[in-house]
UniProtKB/Swiss-Prot annotation:
It catalyses: (2S,6S)-2,6-diaminopimelate = meso-2,6-diaminopimelate. InterPro entries: DAP_epimerase_AS, DAP_epimerase_DapF. The active site is at C72, C220. Pathway: Amino-acid biosynthesis; L-lysine biosynthesis via DAP pathway; DL-2,6-diaminopimelate from LL-2,6-diaminopimelate: step 1/1. Catalyzes the stereoinversion of LL-2,6-diaminopimelate (L,L-DAP) to meso-diaminopimelate (meso-DAP), a precursor of L-lysine and an essential component of the bacterial peptidoglycan. Transmembrane segments: none annotated. This is Diaminopimelate epimerase. One of its GO terms (cellular component) is cytosol. Its EC number is 5.1.1.7. Belongs to the diaminopimelate epimerase family. Homodimer. PANTHER family: DIAMINOPIMELATE EPIMERASE (PTHR31689:SF0), DIAMINOPIMELATE EPIMERASE, CHLOROPLASTIC (PTHR31689).
Length: 278
């Protein structure tokens, strides 16, 4: 199985082109092996590119634990560049089918520098759409208990669930303790991604992400979008915000409540390889 290793701000993926080669029957099991950083290639996710009847191509993502998230913002940027460079598409504006619906990345050319701006779609704010247990309505500044602490959380779905926490002031040990506790909190029947946010200014935030099924990750595109939406909903940030993640910076824009969120950032190829294990 031939693959390409790529990353978006350090969030790394094994990209497999399913247009010209056969793929395994159990991609979740393959992801557990391929993503292992000691015994496999090592990655935050396995990404399969497949034909689509509804879009230019279809993307499936599998976490290191074998689970399949609905979407991945960093992976979609990698996929857009891969598809154009490998001749799967000739245009700079793509449509990609995902479990979260159609996602529309656009490759922006500035000399020899390529970045990707992605129409991530409208955020989903109703509790049932997150999904999150409890009474109907948006979840903004709601208290959740985890361990011996209480957190004020805002829940946003960008096709996958996010629990955004502002001002928790956690050290690394606290991040690694409360991130997984909130991920599996009973309020979230499908588990959740967790973002801990420090507001630096109305146009800039610093974020650490505990990714569902992954753990600490250097970057999360859907998480950055969820943070920007939560910042607007709670009056903490502007509609155009630079999100500083451990792996780098994403520009997130949410022009109006009724419209989509836009994410802009880089993606990089690392190497090509061949998986020879049965």
């Amino acid at each position: 199985m031939e693959f390409t290793k790529m990353h978006g701000l350090g969030n790394d993926f094994v990209i497999v082109n399913g247009f010209g080669q056969s793929l395994p029957d159990d991609p979740g099991a393959l992801a557990r092996r391929v993503c292992d950083r000691r015994l496999g290639v090592g990655a935050d996710g396995l990404v399969l590119l497949l034909p689509s009847a509804a879009a230019d191509l279809r993307m499936r993502v599998f976490n290191p634990d074998g689970s399949e998230p609905e979407m991945c913002g960093n992976a979609i940027r990698c996929v857009a560049l891969y598809a154009r460079r490998r001749g799967l598409v000739a245009k700079t504006q793509l449509e990609v089918e995902t479990l979260a619906g159609l996602i529309r990345p656009e490759i922006l050319l500035d000399g020899d520098r390529e970045t990707v701006r992605v129409d991530m779609g409208r955020p989903r704010l109703e509790r049932a759409e997150i999904p999150m247990r409890g009474p109907a309505g948006p979840v903004v500044g709601e208290v959740l208990d985890a361990g011996e602490r209480s957190f004020m959380v805002t829940a946003v779905s960008m096709g996958n669930p996010h629990c955004v926490v502002f001002g928790a002031d956690l050290d690394d040990a606290g991040f690694r303790k409360y991130g997984p506790l909130l991920e599996v909190h009973p309020a979230f029947p499908a588990r959740t991604n967790v973002e801990f946010v420090e507001v630096l200014s109305p146009g800039e935030v610093a974020v650490r992400v505990w990714e569902r099924g992954v753990g600490p990750t250097p970057a999360c595109g859907t998480g950055a979008c969820a943070v920007a939406v939560a910042g607007v909903l709670t009056g903490r940030t502007a509609r155009r915000v630079h999100v500083r993640l451990p792996g780098g910076v994403l520009l997130i824009e949410w022009p109006d409540d009724a419209g989509p969120v836009y994410m802009s950032g880089p993606a990089e190829e690392v190497f090509d390889g061949k998986w020879v294990r049965a």
